[in-house]
Amino acid sequence: MARDFDVIIFGATGYTGEHISRELHALASKGGAWQGVAWAIGGRSQLKLSAMASKHKLTPAGVVIADTADAASLRSMTARAKVVMNATGPYRFYGEAVVEACIATKTDYVDLCGEPEFIDRCLLKHADAAEAAGVLIVHACAFDSIPADIGCLFTALQFPPPGLCAHADMYHTFDVAADAKGAAAHATTFYAAVHGFGGVGATRAQRKDSPPTCPLLISCCLLAT
């Protein structure tokens, strides 16, 4: 089935969604692999989405309205894209409905979630349906996960057979702009962290219910980072 857009950035007026929109626009403007990609921005408010695009002089191929509280609007949105980049958080409250809509419309899904409870829940509840639909559900594509995953993969590749990397430690170092005054985190990141630490017990209990074959490796790594 033909799709209107290659990519929709959902939650484009949020802190992270706005940044993603700006970066994607810059990539598309430079040509290369992103040249000709039809990307759109999505969210609840046409006014806010249009204002954000105008503010940064962005040229998305479309503006799509959808709300995580309205399943029909989500399916209408996801059906128009090949891939949805979901930037609406905290994911434990707003993410699952988007995952469900993507599976229903056979749309690939990517997020930047760092919330183990949400990732585990999606694996437990939706992995089989996603596989049956041929849909990719890719979590944790952000700074707290990508360096760990790529770093571990790089390290493992340094051990040619019969060598084997059995353990790897990863450390993050963050550079802050010289003119920054104090450390800061966006409100959604703060709320996600509060609920994440507050729900550690529930996350552990959820993992005890996991079948032995459930692939919880990614979210286990997230807890350690």
What residue spans do the PLM features occupy?
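Conserved beta-strand positions in the Rossmann-like core of class I SAM-dependent methyltransferases
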Residues: V37-I41
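Conserved Rossmann-fold cofactor-binding substructure of NAD(P)-dependent oxidoreductases
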Residues: V64-Y94
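Rossmann-fold NAD(P)-binding glycine/threonine-rich loop
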Residues: C113-V135
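ADP-ribose/adenylate-binding Rossmann-like module
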Residues: P90, A101-I119
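Short, conserved SAM-binding/catalytic segment
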Residues: A51-P60
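Active-site-lining helix/loop region of Rossmann-like oxidoreductase modules
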Residues: L157-T225
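N-terminal Rossmann-fold cofactor-binding loop
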Residues: G42-Q46, D67-T68
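N-terminal Rossmann NAD(P)H-binding glycine-rich loop of SDR-like oxidoreductase domains
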Residues: A2-K30
